[in-house]
Amino acid sequence: MPDAPADQASVSLLTADLASAHKLMQEGKFDQAIGDLQSLQASHPEAKGLDLELGTAYYKKSDFPKAIEYLKKASAADPNNGEATQLLGLSYYLGGHPAEAIPLLEKVQGWYSRANVDAAYILGICYIQTKDYPRARAAFARMFDVPPDSAAAYMFTARMLLRQEFDPVAEEYAQKAAAVDPKLPLVHFLLGELYLYKSRVPEAIAEFQKELTINPGHAQTYYKLADAYSRIQKFEDAERLLQRSIWLDATSTGPYILMGKVLEKKGEFELAVRALQRAATMDPNNPTTHHLLGQAYRDMGKKEEAESELKLAEQLQSQQSSHP
């Protein structure tokens, strides 16, 4: 067998080249990895698995049409390769083709680290985008290990629908969840958030109050209810609720920022500044906090501090706009 050592050397070289390409991908050098893999494919046309490697590189580069081209070849060559099938499905989804993604993602429901996302979640989103809401609910129920007809399944699906801006269906599903189990924690909070987002303030207030009846230790509900009250100029109620939210959770900046806004509206500028300074310490790069601080200082007649904060807010805003 005179060719055996040469074959072994060729395999070793191929393995080393693949390891090098993987390292380049980990470093984010996708074009270099793709170039090396294409050279490898040209010099080793008989080598298996290179279409999957190239498809993966294009997937990680977010070049989904090219990823689809190579992953289709990889799937055709080995129909039982779950990774190739799942990556092809994800590439279709991320390339804006959810209907093509669904049968592939249905076929492979496991987790593959190469994809770096939960394919079960993506499958649920594909169902939403193709308006197949019952199957979306079944997918999310499976993801969260709850029965598909449970209140929790309806609530999880409502949350995902809201995230995808399918607001009317989200409202319908959240209401269904509340009807199935009116005491399900966070279902009234979700409805309140939805109504607040739609500026349906009285309905939002009613839902947040229901949530507090069954879930009185939830800091976010006090915060969101305070937000609703502040929108109808009920600043005393808003301040009282914000204080409760902060007592329950002093790690969130939102309640401190809203407290600053509420106190400024009440004319309590020094207390407003104190709340906003606390928020700025926790998150120095939030332009809203610095803008509100600038306004509060201006109301107090502190011109230099006001200009400094407003200038900083503008700088942070422009930085965020240039790096979305």
Indicate residue ranges for each PLM-predicted region:
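Helix-start (N-cap) detector for alpha-helical repeat units in TPR-like alpha-solenoids
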Residues: 14, 48-49, 82-83, 115-118, ...
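Structural marker of alpha-solenoid helical repeat scaffolds
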Residues: 43, 77, 110-112, 145-146, ...
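Structural signature of tandem alpha-helical TPR/SEL1-like repeats
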Residues: 27-35, 61-73, 95-107, 128-142, ...
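Terminal, low-structured helical/coil segments at or just beyond the last alpha-helical repeat
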Residues: 3-6, 288-324
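TPR-adjacent "capping" and linker segments in tetratricopeptide-repeat scaffold/adaptor proteins
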Residues: 2-16, 111-115, 320
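Canonical tetratricopeptide repeat
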Residues: 53, 87, 121-122, 156, ...
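Alpha-helical segment of the N-proximal tetratricopeptide repeat
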Residues: 13-47, 56, 60, 125, ...
